[in-house]
């Protein structure tokens, strides 16, 4: 069983990718709370560990070249965020469905080729994994994306 912080990392990456793909190529403000859920600051006003980890995931995606942003709003959001070329192509790319197990894909051979292409796209698989709620499915898809 994976450590919970790693499972949260994969879920955050998947949610960030899904949200940025929906707005591509527009730049948006990406709020940590929209990805990780509500924050519960401590008595000193410091963000909870989960919130901080999500913000760090956003920064990590930028440092590794998957997203671009112009500035931060404290540790609460990134401003003017968009997918980079690397991030966009990773999400548009077709994944080998044989590599992934545990993700429900409607890969009917009788469907038109264009629909089959959609079902094999990385972003479709990210959305399906998030929809399933399965940590294992999310981990598989994100690991495969980050290896490309």
Task: Indicate residue ranges for each PLM-predicted region.
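Generic structural signal for hydrophobic core residues of well-folded globular domains
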Residues: 20-24, 61, 90-94
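Short amphipathic alpha-helical interface segments
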Residues: 2-45, 52
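A short, conserved structural fragment
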Residues: 59-75
